[in-house]
Design a protein with these regions (language model features):
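Non-ligating segments of multi-cofactor redox enzymes
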Residues: 1-175
Length: 175
């Protein structure tokens, strides 16, 4: 299988959050109790039960509020710093040739904060037991020829999925 990638085109994102819901549903992640903080943004951050979220940036421009959206999730780096940070426990975090960066059961032997600190995007999260969580790119779906749940759910075309060279070409074309 070719290396696969997700392309995020923020210019097409309407912040409907269907990607968040699809991720929670597919991965059977529990709902989080949140409070209204005066923003449309919810939940407030990634967590052990929120692996994908839309972050809102509110900017005032010409007297009006512009909402800018950023999809926060694991970037499934070409050379993942989290994999390098986990080298003391071989196989704890792997970069699958198909694209996903996957955390295995062996990761329980790692210091979760060290793994989070290694990520330049501050993505991995951990629970009270120290177990590490992050977007898996729906590796179980991808390895069976399906799109990640978030991409399948995106009705605006903000999320695209395919072979990495095709996604890079699509990104270049849209710039």
């Amino acid at each position: 299988m070719d290396e696969m990638a997700i392309l995020i085109d923020v210019s097409k994102c309407t912040a409907c959050r269907s990607c968040q819901v699809a991720c929670k549903n597919w991965n059977q992640l529990k709902a989080e109790k949140t409070t209204n903080r005066g923003s449309h943004e919810n939940p407030p951050d990634l967590s052990s039960s929120t692996w994908n979220r839309i972050r809102f940036h509110e900017a005032i421009k010409d007297g009006r509020i512009d909402l800018l959206f950023i999809n926060e999730r694991c970037r499934h780096c070409a050379e993942p710093p989290c994999v390098a940070a986990a080298e003391d426990v071989p196989g704890a975090i792997i970069k699958d040739p198909a694209g996903p960066v996957v955390i295995t059961e062996k990761a329980k032997q790692l210091n979760a904060q060290d793994i989070r600190d290694a990520c330049p995007f501050d993505i991995p999260r951990f629970d009270e037991t120290g177990q590490i969580f992050k977007c898996t790119m729906c590796a179980d779906r991808v390895l069976n020829g399906l799109k990640p749940a978030c991409v399948q759910a995106c009705s605006t075309g903000a999320l695209s999925f395919g072979p990495k060279p095709a996604m890079l070409a699509l990104a270049e074309k849209s710039m």
